[in-house]
Structure formats: C-alpha cells, structure tokens
C-alpha cells in the first residue's frame, strides 16, 4: 500500500477548462498530516507510517494518547490513521501534505457515507414497488416473499430486507485529481466522494492504477 493523506471534505463546486468545459469537483482540505510513529519490520513486524491530523483539546485526550503524541513531539489530533509502506522512510514529526499528489493522477477516496437511518427495501435495495391497483391493498411498498416453506424452513443469511442504511465505510476508486493547491492545502478531485461536508476522508493513490 502506498502512502496517503487524511483530509476533510469541504463540498463540491465546478471549474472550467480553457476550452470552456465544466468539470464537477469535490474540494478536499488536506491539513498537514503529522507523523506520530514510523513502524518497521524489526520493531513491529511490518512497515507503516502513523499520522494524525487536526487538533483536539487536552481534556479530550487520554493519558496513553497524550504520552504517544508527546513522544513524537506533535500536537494531539482529532484522528489517527496508519498507512502501510513498501519503501520510503519517515521520522516522527515529519509533515505530509497535498504535494504528494499531482494533477492528472488517479486516487482512491475513502469516507463514511451519509447515514439514512432505518429504510425499506425500495430505498435501500432499489426493489420495485408492487401494483397500485388490481386488487393490491396496503402492500404497495412491501418486499414480498422472503423465503420458502418447510424446506429450508428459515430465511437465508444475506437476504435483502429493510434495515439500517448508510453510515458505513465506502471507497470510490480511480478519481482524477484535477488540481492541487499547495498554498491553501486543497485537493480538487473530479466527481463526488463519500460522506457529508466536514467529514474525514482518506486519499490514496489509486490501487488499480498502480498495477
């Protein structure tokens, strides 16, 4: 896995090319990612870099976390993320920002999707509705049969039914980086990314583009 960064979703807008073509983009703020720990095969059994981003009040930091951040000589952040590494070398206190990406590069963006609460099968799984007329009554949005009879005598695991929708980890792959604004720590990515405005995002070089 290649090094990535943790950012914050700012929202969507559009930019225009020199030919006048409108491109919808998501603006991602890449605050400086502070390295809190560099893991090696000798000490941890694998190579990885651990980063934190943002700020957190001292009253919200546990004693163990405070000691970990103090050892790395970095300020406490709102979240901690780890990236596996195949090569490269980092030291605690190093900064990683949007400059590791370039315009035209493909990236994978991971975030938590918007929570929709408890939803029925039509919204959750795109089931079709039943007839509005022809004798149908009070069953316009019900899923219908969910199984068989005495054999097997149960509902199979994984059956698509009503339930909680959204609020889960989602990755959108191979999005194009349209622009990198290193001065303002902004990354403009073509298209939409998961989650609500203000949510944390993990941006990595695209897995499928790395071969």
Curated annotation (Swiss-Prot):
The keyword Ribonucleoprotein applies. It comes from the Bacteria. The modification N5-methylglutamine is found at residue 150. One of its GO terms (molecular function) is structural constituent of ribosome. Part of the 50S ribosomal subunit. Forms a cluster with proteins L14 and L19. Belongs to the universal ribosomal protein uL3 family. This is Large ribosomal subunit protein uL3. The gene is rplC.
């Amino acid at each position: 896995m290649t090094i990535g960064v943790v950012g914050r979703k700012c929202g969507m807008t559009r930019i225009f090319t020199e030919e006048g073509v409108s491109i919808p983009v998501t603006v991602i703020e890449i605050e400086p990612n502070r390295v809190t720990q560099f893991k090696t095969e000798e000490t941890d059994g694998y190579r990885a870099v651990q980063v934190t981003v943002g700020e957190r009040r001292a009253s919200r930091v546990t004693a163990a976390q405070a000691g970990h951040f103090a050892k790395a000589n970095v300020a406490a952040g709102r979240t901690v993320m780890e990236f596996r590494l195949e090569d490269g070398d980092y030291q605690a206190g190093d900064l990683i920002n949007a400059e590791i990406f370039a315009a035209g590069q493909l990236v994978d963006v991971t975030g938590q999707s918007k929570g929709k609460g408890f939803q029925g099968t039509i919204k959750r799984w795109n089931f079709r509705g039943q007839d509005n007329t022809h004798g149908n009554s009070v069953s316009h949005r019900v899923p219908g049969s969910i199984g068989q009879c005495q054999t097997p005598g149960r509902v199979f695991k994984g059956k698509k039914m009503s339930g909680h929708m959204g609020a889960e980890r989602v990755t959108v792959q191979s999005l194009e980086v349209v622009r990198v604004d290193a001065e303002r720590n902004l990354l403009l990515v073509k298209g939409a990314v998961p989650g609500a405005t203000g949510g944390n995002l993990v941006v990595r070089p695209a897995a499928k583009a790395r071969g």
